[in-house]
């Protein structure tokens, strides 16, 4: 029988924290270091689990404070919290309601469904910040690049090109920072090397996996596929059966895996044959690419889980490397 858990639900904002304590009392405090410290000390005295939603960079200081004081913390999925609130008839959405729903949703989950935040190394923290910065710079570059038109006047075009050149330099610097963060940590460096031994997996996918999935290797095949958003999800109702389609998943990881699948379907001998077999059997090309991206996600997770695991190599390349020549066997007299 599941025992009742003490939960502190927190709705995190840029400037404010809305808190719902285990006894139902609510607080509205500033999102500053001193206020966060007082709040986590209070949670530690209560022996409570601190729960909050993923909000980009704003919940990171709160998570670090929990880890520093050995307080268990859980980062919940905002989609699940919202669906839980609607199931309780709470259609309104305010910060005060959100912190209460976060507390109630976490309390309703089984103990094994609460995935506690694990401490990150300094290299992992730097890598995560650099990957996020690179993403924002690429977004800014795309906005400026899309402003070029055929009838653009020369002066405006000059300003836009100057901005693009500046962004390109900054993107290169941030990518160098990502590589430096990986090189400074032995575990990250080894995983990066092993990931990139797989044809189709490049530096972009490797950085995103190491930055956004510090617990890579702890999943089974179904869990990693669902987390990456490339697992087919069944949708049935009585006699109606819809096509199983991937749903949700981590957006950045999903995009990076898809582009890796495009590369692997051309350059990776094993995955290319898998892709071509699916297309030959009538699967649409995008569905086949999604299946390839799922294979890559499972392969990366297996590499991280088993230090001695080595993915299968291209048999043609292996034969060349070993100097073996295939031909008809000689008859022995």
Model-derived features: where do they sit?
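Phosphate- and other anionic-substrate recognition elements at nucleic-acid/protein interfaces
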Residues: 1-158, 165-168
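Phosphate-backbone recognition surface of nucleic-acid-processing proteins
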Residues: 28-29, 34, 203, 207-281, ...
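Short low-complexity, flexible loop/linker segments enriched in glycine and/or proline
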Residues: 88-92, 248-250, 302
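Amphipathic alpha-helical interaction segments
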Residues: 101, 159-162, 166, 208, ...
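Short helix-capping/linker segments at secondary-structure and domain boundaries
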Residues: 109-114, 144, 214-218, 264-270, ...
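Helix-hairpin-helix/helix-loop-helix acidic hairpins
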Residues: 148-204, 213, 268
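Low-complexity, acidic/Ser/Thr- and charged residue-rich accessory regions of DNA metabolism proteins
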Residues: 238-239, 243, 274-333
């Amino acid at each position: 029988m599941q025992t009742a858990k003490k939960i502190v639900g927190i709705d995190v904002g840029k400037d404010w924290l809305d808190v719902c304590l285990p006894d139902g009392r609510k607080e509205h405090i500033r999102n500053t270091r001193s206020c966060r410290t007082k709040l986590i000390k209070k949670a530690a005295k209560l022996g409570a689990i601190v729960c909050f939603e993923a909000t980009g960079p704003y919940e990171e200081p709160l998570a670090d404070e929990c880890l520093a004081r050995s307080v268990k913390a859980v980062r919940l999925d905002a989609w699940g919290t919202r669906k839980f609130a609607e199931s309780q008839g709470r259609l309104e959405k305010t910060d005060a309601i959100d912190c209460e729903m976060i507390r109630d949703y976490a309390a309703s989950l089984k103990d094994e469904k609460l995935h506690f935040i694990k401490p990150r190394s300094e290299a992992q923290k730097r890598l995560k910040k650099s990957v996020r910065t690179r993403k924002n710079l690429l977004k800014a570059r795309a906005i400026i690049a899309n402003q070029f038109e055929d009838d653009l006047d020369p002066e405006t075009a000059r300003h836009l090109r100057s901005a693009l050149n500046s962004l390109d330099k900054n993107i290169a610097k941030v990518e160098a920072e990502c590589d430096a963060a990986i090189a400074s940590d032995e575990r990250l460096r080894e995983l990066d090397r092993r990931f990139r031994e797989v044809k189709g997996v490049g530096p972009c996918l490797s950085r995103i996996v190491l930055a956004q999935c510090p617990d890579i290797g702890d999943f089974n095949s179904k869990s990693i596929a669902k987390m990456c958003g490339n697992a087919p999800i069944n949708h049935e109702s009585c006699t109606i059966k819809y096509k199983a389609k991937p749903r949700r998943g981590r957006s950045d990881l999903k995009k990076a895996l898809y582009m890796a699948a495009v590369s692997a379907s051309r350059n990776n001998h094993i995955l290319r044959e898998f892709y071509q077999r699916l297309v030959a059997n009538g699967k649409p090309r995008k569905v086949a690419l999604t299946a390839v991206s799922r294979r890559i996600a499972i392969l990366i997770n297996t590499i991280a889980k088993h230090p001695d695991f080595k993915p299968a190599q291209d048999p043609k390349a292996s034969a060349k490397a070993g100097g073996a020549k295939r031909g008809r066997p000689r008859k022995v007299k």
